């Protein structure tokens, strides 16, 4: 599943909805306090797309900004099914290593080896899991 955390840049949303569903699953947009439990399979990978930096992801401008701890709370409260064993890929600029390390710390050790981010500026197109751009959170 792709989960889009950008509400002010239509190009991010557009790219999310144009990704190959056989690789990435269906795309959903984040709405505050809206449950997406049931959309993500227990073993399905989760691809998060947004604008980002080493401290936050979300909108390009103001209005939606999530620290790693805030994203972890959203994911555990509204997205991840019980017993989730898939991987989480944060496709946003500069999310590795600091942001995804914070996300791993917030989600806990059960997620070790399953959270990835990106170094530097990235293109809007989400890359498949085996792409060399993904950096594992440590």
Model-predicted regions and their roles:
Residues 29, 37-38, 77-78, 84, ...:
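Hydrophobic transmembrane signal anchors and adjacent membrane-proximal interface regions, especially
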Residues 124-138:
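A cross-taxonomic marker for long C-terminal extensions/tails that follow the last structured domain
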Residues 1-40, 67, 91:
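A domain-level signal for caspase-like cysteine endopeptidase catalytic cores
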Residues 45-128:
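Catalytic cores of nucleophile-dependent amide-cleaving enzymes
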């Amino acid at each position: 599943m792709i989960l889009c955390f950008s509400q002010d840049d239509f190009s991010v949303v557009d790219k999310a909805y144009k990704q190959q569903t056989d690789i990435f699953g269906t795309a959903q947009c984040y709405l505050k306090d809206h449950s997406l439990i049931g959309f993500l399979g227990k073993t399905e990978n989760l691809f998060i797309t947004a604008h980002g930096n080493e401290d936050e992801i979300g909108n390009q401008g103001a209005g939606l900004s999530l620290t790693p701890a805030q994203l972890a709370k959203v994911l555990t409260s509204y997205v991840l099914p019980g017993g989730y064993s898939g991987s989480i890929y944060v496709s946003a600029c500069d999310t590795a290593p600091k942001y995804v390390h914070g996300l791993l710390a917030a989600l806990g050790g059960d997620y070790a080896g399953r959270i990835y981010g990106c170094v530097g500026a990235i293109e809007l197109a989400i890359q498949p899991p085996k792409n060399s751009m993904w950096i594992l959170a440590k």
